[in-house]
């Protein structure tokens, strides 16, 4: 588990002076639920989850999904359209999707053991956020994906998770709270 540095007191004071509340909820939000990054990424892409996978910190975060697509190229085009920017495809598996199925997890999946599991479940494409192979833990994922014939599709950490906080806006508004989703610029170097 990683400890986050405390928020600097001057930032806290500036937020208080402007009556700004901050809500931060990470791993519990990552758990597959109506509010999770995976669920909302699947919804945005128009794919249908049928099973959860990838456990981290005692919660399941990834989804196996049925899609209307038959090829990596078709699915990648849909991802580009939905995310609104270029993506990166590492074609370690076949161009044909197995029965139109894919796996996805917003952000970044750090466990290289999932690629064997995905192939056992008949999946040959995994969409996630961070796929830049120069990061050591990502390099291990590339090796495992290549070994097991699973194509990696990278969409950036932010872009694969942004649909979750966008959905949370609706949740808070339903409670009568004014809130706003503030977009950021995707870090394309994560691809």
Predicted regions: what they are:
Residues 1-191:
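Active-site catalytic microenvironments in core metabolic enzymes, especially phosphate/sugar-handling
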């Amino acid at each position: 588990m990683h400890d986050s540095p405390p928020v600097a007191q001057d930032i806290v004071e500036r937020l208080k002076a402007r009556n700004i509340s901050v809500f931060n909820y990470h791993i519990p939000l990552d758990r597959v639920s109506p509010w999770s990054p995976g669920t909302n990424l699947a919804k945005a892409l128009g794919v249908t989850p049928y099973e959860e996978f990838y456990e981290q910190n005692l919660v399941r975060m990834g989804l196996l999904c049925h899609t209307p697509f038959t090829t990596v190229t078709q699915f990648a085009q849909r991802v580009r359209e939905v995310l609104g920017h270029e993506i990166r495809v590492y074609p370690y598996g076949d161009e044909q999707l197995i029965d139109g199925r894919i796996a996805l997890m917003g952000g970044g999946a750090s466990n290289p053991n999932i690629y064997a599991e995905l192939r056992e479940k008949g999946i040959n494409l995994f969409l996630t956020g961070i796929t830049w192979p120069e990061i050591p833990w990502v390099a291990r994922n590339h090796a495992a994906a290549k070994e097991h014939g699973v194509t990696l599709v990278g969409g950036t950490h932010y872009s694969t998770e942004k649909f979750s906080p966008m959905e949370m806006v609706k949740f808070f508004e339903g409670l009568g709270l004014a809130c706003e989703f503030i977009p950021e610029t995707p870090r394309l170097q994560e691809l």
